[in-house]
């Protein structure tokens, strides 16, 4: 009998911290390839978030898993401004980010969606 693979069998979630800069890199990988990743850079008054998803690969549940991992970081649990850059047109990803914020404003910039909001904390 063939065993079917689940998300947890096919993909790995990893978080790496650049201690000298206080930046975080969260990724979902399939073997050596990034399926989706997020870079988080906190400052005194805000957090910059940049998310990228490989074309045609990441199901909505994987993107949600990535965003859940990002917002589980301690740095995302204090009320401050979120400045996020997401792939333009990825409404599932935008909705997942917006659930963690208030006063969300979006605008298009090239192939990106820029999101400003206030973290719930």
Report each predicted region and the residues it spans:
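Conserved GNAT acetyl-CoA-binding A-motif
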Residues: 74-86
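C-terminal "cap" of GNAT-fold acetyltransferases
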Residues: 110-121
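Conserved acetyl-CoA-binding loop-helix of GNAT-fold acetyltransferases
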Residues: 58-72, 99
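Conserved beta-hairpin
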Residues: 18-36
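Conserved active-site alpha-helix within GNAT-family acetyltransferase domains
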Residues: 88-106
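Conserved GNAT-family N-acetyltransferase fold
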Residues: 36-38, 51
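Conserved acetyl-CoA binding element of GNAT-fold acetyltransferases
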Residues: 45-57
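Conserved N-terminal entry element of GNAT/NAT acetyltransferase domains
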Residues: 1-19
């Amino acid at each position: 009998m063939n065993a079917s693979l689940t998300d947890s069998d096919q993909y790995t979630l990893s978080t790496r911290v650049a201690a000298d800069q206080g930046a975080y890199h969260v990724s979902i990988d399939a073997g050596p390839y990034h399926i989706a990743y997020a870079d988080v850079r906190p400052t005194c008054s805000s957090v910059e978030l940049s998310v990228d998803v490989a074309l045609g690969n990441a199901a909505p549940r994987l993107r949600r898993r990535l965003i859940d991992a990002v917002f589980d970081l301690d740095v995302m649990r204090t009320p401050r401004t979120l400045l996020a850059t997401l792939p333009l047109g990825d409404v599932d990803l935008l909705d997942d980010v917006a659930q963690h914020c208030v006063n969300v404003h979006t605008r298009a910039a090239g192939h990106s969606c820029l999101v400003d909001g206030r973290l719930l904390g």
